[in-house]
Amino acid sequence: MADWTVRVHPQAEAELKAIPADMQARFLHIAELLEAFGPQKVGMPHVRPLERKLWEMRMHGRDGIARAVYAAVQGRALLVLHVFVKKTQATPRSAIETALKRLESVK
């Protein structure tokens, strides 16, 4: 099929482990969808564009809402840059800035 891979930035891996287990399971489900079908075929309610090259995975759980910000890098790879529990309606600017800094560090 699509042959996409989802990788996780080392700092985002620690953030992912810190969110509740049900949200981690949802993250894995969305990552599997992205790998199987590619980012062009997966949309709302699973993923949504943020700005520039950034997209977000949307995870819901018993304890609230979490997001994983990712970008396409080198070929058919998606790199998860930042994972956080969302507390406001809008994605915090600081979360976007963190993801952009991490994206620059891997280029």
Roles of regions detected by a PLM:
Residues 68:
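Portal/gating segments that form or line small-molecule/metal binding sites
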Residues 71:
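Conserved Hanks-type protein kinase catalytic core
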